Amino acid sequence: MATTSPCAAPSPSLRCPLALSHPFASPPPPPALRLAGPKLLPGRLAVSPPPGIPAVASALESLILDLDDDEEDEDEETEFGLFQGEAWAAADEREAVRSPELVVPELEELPEQWRRSRIAWLCKELPAYKHSTFTRILNAQRKWITQDDATYVAVHCLRIRNNDAAFRVYSWMVRQHWFRFNFALATRVADCLGRDGKVEKCREVFEAMVKQGRVPAESTFHILIVAYLSVPKGRCLEEACTIYNQMIQMGGYKPRLSLHNSLFRALVSKTGGTAKYNLKQAEFVYHNVVTTNLDVHKDVYAGLIWLHSYQDVIDRERIIALRKEMKQAGFDEGIDVLVSVMRAFSKEGNVAETEATWHNILQSGSDLPVQAYVCRMEAYARTGEPMKSLDMFKEMKDKNIPPNVASYHKIIEIMTKALEVDIVEQLMNEFIESDMKHLMPAFLDLMYMYMDLDMHEKLELTFLKCIARCRPNRILYTIYLESLVKVGNIEKAEEVFGEMHNNGMIGTNTKSCNIMLRGYLSAEDYQKAEKVYDMMSKKKYDVQADSLEKLQSGLLLNKKVIKPKTVSMKLDQEQREILIGLLLGGTRMESYAQRGVHIVHFQFQEDSNAHSVLRVHIHERFFEWLSSASRSFDDGSKIPYQFSTIPHQHFSFFVDQFFLKGQPVLPKLIHRWLTPRVLAYWFMFGGSKLPSGDIVLKLSGGNSEGVERIVNSLHTQSLTSKVKRKGRFFWIGFQGSNAESFWRIIEPHVLNNFASLVTQEGSSIGSDGTQDTDTDSDDDMQMSDTERDE
C-alpha cells in the first residue's frame, strides 16, 4: 500500500476565490463559478503560483537524475538575451493577473457520511500512485462518484501542489458520461500546470477550453506564454508568439508590460542571422505596447533597430523613425544602437552615413567595438574600394583591438572578391594560426576565388586543408567536384561524386548532379550520363537544358532515344525504414483535406548541430516527396528546420499504424520493423549517446504493452534495456555492454561523425522542445527491465 505524508489529507475548506473581469464568460450557475469574490484568505485553498516558474529540466536530466520538482528559480526570466539584468518582467506582475473564482463545497457540507469518507480516502491515496494504478482506482469509483466529488479531489491535488495528479483526475473526469464543462476548474488546472512548467498539459487544457467555445481567462494566456518562454534555449518561442497573438486577437486582452517585454526579449535573444526572421512579431509587440499607452523600454528601441539592421533589404525610413521616437522618449543612443545603424548603412554602401555614425562612437569615449570596423569594411567594399577595407582591418589591429571571427570572415570575403590572392592567403594563414573556430566560410571564399582564377591545384590543396580542420559539407564538395570537371579529371570527379552520394552527412543535390552530368557528357560517356539522368528524374531534380540536349544527341548516335519517363511515386525500402525511425522519435503526420491523403511534417531543433546535419540529409533523401516551396533550397545552410512533404496517399499506411485520432501510438507489429536502419534513425532523431557511453532513446506515443513489445524485440537481439516513463514519453536506455552492442548494430547506418555531435548534445533529445518540457514531472516511472527474465 502506498503511503502519503500527513499534508496529503484533504482540507475541510476547499474554496479558492480569485476574481477576474471576464467579458466573454456567460453567467454560470452558482456556486461553481463566481466572477466577483473576496480576497484570497490564508486559511482557504491556496493554489496561487509560487514566486517563479520552476526551472524546466532537460529530458535527459529528468531521465538520469532524480530531480526535485519543487525547485524554483525566481530569476528564470531575467537572465537572457538583450535585457540581461533588467527587472521589468518581474514575477510580481505575473501574480497580479487573476483567474476566475472556483468555489468547491466543504467536505462536511456533503450529506452522506460514506461519501465524505470515500472522498477523503481518495484525496489521501491517489496522489501517491502512478498513472496505471491511479486510473484503475478512479474507474472503481464510477458507480458512486459525481462531478462535484471528482472536482473536490482535483482541487485538493492542486492545493497540495500535485498538479500532475490534478491533471489526471481532470482528464479522467472529461471522459465520463456525466461530465459538464467547468470553465473555472479548467482555468485553475491550466494555470497551475503552466506555473509548474508543464506546457504540453497546460496547452491541452487550453485547447479544450477553445473547443468548448470559451475564451480562456487572461491568466491562462499569460501563464502559458511565460511557461513557453521558460523552456530552455527558446525552443518554444513560436508557440509563445502564437498564444500571445491569440491573447490579443481572440481574447481581446491587453497584456501587461512585463509580458510584452519578456516576449520581445526572447525574440532578440538569438544571433542576428536567426533573429532577423522575428522582425514582424517584434514590430507587433512594439505596436501593442505603444497602442496601450505603456512605457517603451530603451532596449525595445535598440532591439528593433538591431533586427532591422540584419534584414536583407534595409527599411531606412523605419530605422530613422525608430531613432526619432527613441530620442523623443528621452533615451540616448548607446553603442549597440550606433553599431546597428552602421550595419544598416554599410549594407547600402552609404559610406558618408557609416562614417558619421562611426564619428559618434568615437565621441562617446567608449571602447571601439570590432563590429563597427566590420561595418566600415563592408561599406567601403560595396563602393568598390576593397583596399580601404583592408586599411580598416589593419587600423583595428594597430589599435590593439584583437580581430574576431566575424572580422576575419568579412575581410577574407572582400579580398577574395577583389581577387587579391597574396593578401587573401596571408589573411587565411593568420586566421588558421589564431586557433579560432568557424573556418569553413573563409575556406569556401578562398576556393571560389581559385575557381574564378582557374587555379585548380591550389583549390585542391585548400579542399584537403579544409576537410582536415572542418566538418565537410555539400557546398565544399560541390566546389571541388566542379573544379575536377573543369580540368577534365572525370575519374576523380566520379570518385568524389560517389563519396557525396554515399555519405549521408554530405549528400548530392541538383547542382552536384548537373555538374557530374556535364562531366560525363564532356567525356562522351553517355551510358553513365544516362544513369545520372535517371537518378535526377527519380529525385525530380531539374536538368539543365543544354545538358539534356547533349545527352539526347549523344544517345541518338547510338540509336537510342530519351523519352520522358513517368516516375512512379513510391517510397523505397530505405525511405520507409527512415520514416519509421523518425516517427518513433516524434515526427508528425496529418491528414490533408482530401480523404486518404496525408502529409509528413519534418521538424528539427535549431539549437542542435546533430539535428542540423540530419535536417540536410533528410531533405536530400526525401527531396522528390517535398513540396515545391521546400525543394527550392539548393544551399544546405538555407534549408529550413521545418519542411513538409506533398500530400500523398502513400503515407496513409504510416498514419494508420502510428496515429489514432491524431495522437501517436505504437503499431502492433512494431517489434517486427526494428531493423538496424530504423534503430539508427530513431537514435539520430530522438536519441543521445552519453559521455559514459550509455545510449538513450526517446519514444513518442504508445503504451506499456507497445513498449514491452519493443523491449522484447530488442531482447531477442541480445540487447537488455531499461525503460522509464516520464510524463507522456518513454525512455529506453542501454548501459555498458548493451550500449556497445546497440552501437555496433546501428553504426553502419549512422551518419559519419554523427556520434560526436549527439554526444555533445546529450541534453537535447527529440524533435520538439515542447515535448521535453513535461518530462520533469513526478509522473509514473515504469521499469521494464528485461533482466527480470533472468
UniProtKB/Swiss-Prot annotation:
Sequence segments annotated as region (Disordered): 762-790
InterPro entries: Chloro/Mito_RNA_Process, Homing_endonucl, LAGLIDADG_dom, Pentatricopeptide_rpt, TPR-like_helical_dom_sf
Disruption phenotype: Chlorophyll deficiency and seedling lethality when grown under normal light or low light.
One annotated GO molecular function: endonuclease activity
GO biological process, one term: photosystem I assembly
Places the protein is found: Plastid, Chloroplast
Bias (Acidic residues) ranges: 771-790
GO terms for cellular component: chloroplast
Claim: Transit peptide is one of the keywords in the record: yes
Keyword presence, Repeat: yes
Predominant localisation class: plastid
Record-linked Gene3D superfamilies: Homing endonucleases, Tetratricopeptide repeat domain
Source taxon at top rank: Eukaryota
Pfam family of the protein (one): PPR_3
Transit peptide (residue range): 1-56
TM regions (residue ranges): none
Recorded coiled-coil stretches: none
Keywords for the protein's UniProt record, in alphabetical order: Chloroplast, mRNA processing, mRNA splicing, Plastid, Repeat, Transit peptide
PPR repeat placement: 182-216, 217-254, 256-296, 299-333, 334-368, 369-403, 404-438, 439-469, 473-507, 509-543
PANTHER family in the record: PENTATRICOPEPTIDE REPEAT-CONTAINING PROTEIN OTP51, CHLOROPLASTIC
Protein family according to the UniProt entry: Belongs to the PPR family. P subfamily.
Its job: Promotes the splicing of group II introns in chloroplasts. Required for the splicing of intron 2 of plastid ycf3 transcripts, a factor required for the assembly of photosystem I (PSI). Involved in the splicing of atpF, ndhA, petB and rps16 chloroplastic transcripts. Required for the assembly of PSI.
Protein's recorded name: Pentatricopeptide repeat-containing protein OTP51, chloroplastic
Native source organism of the sequence: Oryza sativa subsp. japonica (Rice)
